[in-house]
């Protein structure tokens, strides 16, 4: 489990590997079930798409990371989730993903 600072660093490092250059090209969210949310509901291609997720210390930490990237212009919304919502995920928005 990681701190907000560690997760922000990991996501920023992974963003540098993307060919996209704007935060608005990405979606940030939090969940308690990465497979369901990222690969199911958002329809992200697990094998060929750009995505990352990290496990936060707790829900409050996950929310701090989410709000950080939303303030930079990523797509997504705050709110929702349960106490076990500790996963922060980010993916590149494409014509096949569902926001």
Predicted region positions:
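GIY-YIG nuclease catalytic motif and its immediate N-terminal context
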Residues: 1-99
């Amino acid at each position: 489990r990681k701190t907000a600072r560690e997760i922000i660093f990991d996501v920023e490092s992974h963003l540098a590997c993307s060919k996209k250059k704007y935060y608005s090209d990405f979606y940030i969210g939090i969940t308690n079930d990465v497979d369901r949310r990222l690969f199911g509901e958002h329809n992200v291609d697990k094998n060929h798409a750009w995505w990352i997720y990290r496990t936060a210390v707790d829900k409050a930490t996950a929310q701090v990371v989410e709000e950080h990237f939303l303030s930079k212009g990523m797509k997504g919304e705050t709110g929702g989730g349960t106490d076990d919502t500790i996963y922060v995920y980010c993916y590149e928005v494409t014509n096949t993903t569902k926001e």
